[in-house]
């Protein structure tokens, strides 16, 4: 999907966000205090976002301040796919409540089409959205991702320490996976 400010969320603006209305009709508001997103900490960054998204709002809005943040790529599946495109992501994330916040857990597979003494898997029988929609010989569900829906932070965990491909990714990207 093309990036657009209409798909992004601004946080830390000068106005409150509407959360919900109480049974008595009172509007409850709040302000984002998370660390997710990209800080709009200077005019140069605001101009860069205006150019990137083709929108003037970051430059002309009275609501954007140096403390404002832009959160884009908010879809949890798209977010992890951009972060780790070399993994194959299951299309069925599931929500959990962790520390009072909604977080999504996603399964990821390491795969290869080059593994000794193995034969190609028949992918015709796999369900749609399995994340395994390509030719492979080797596949393991070795990685889990946890995406915080409030601030967008993503934590990747290797859950199968015996997977040599996951270990190679961990060596190649030492700061990507959480211990």
Map each language-model feature to its residues.
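Soluble extracytoplasmic regions of secretory-pathway and membrane proteins
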Residues: 1-179
């Amino acid at each position: 999907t093309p990036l657009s400010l209409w798909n992004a969320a601004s946080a830390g603006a000068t106005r409150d966000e509407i959360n919900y209305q109480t049974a008595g009709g009172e509007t409850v508001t709040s302000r984002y205090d998370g660390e997710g997103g990209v800080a709009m900490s200077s005019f140069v960054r605001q101009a860069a976002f205006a150019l990137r998204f083709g929108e003037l709002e970051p430059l002309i809005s009275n609501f954007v301040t140096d403390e404002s943040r832009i959160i884009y790529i908010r879809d949890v599946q798209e977010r992890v796919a951009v972060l780790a495109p070399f993994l194959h992501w299951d299309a069925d994330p599931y929500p959990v409540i962790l520390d009072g916040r909604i977080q999504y857990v996603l399964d990821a597979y390491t795969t290869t089409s080059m593994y000794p003494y193995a034969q190609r898997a028949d992918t015709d029988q796999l369900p749609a959205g399995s994340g395994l929609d390509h030719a492979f010989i080797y596949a393991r569900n070795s990685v889990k991702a946890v995406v915080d829906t409030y601030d967008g932070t993503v934590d990747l965990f290797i859950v199968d320490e015996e997977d040599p491909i996951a270990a190679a990714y961990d060596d190649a990207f030492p700061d990507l996976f959480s211990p």
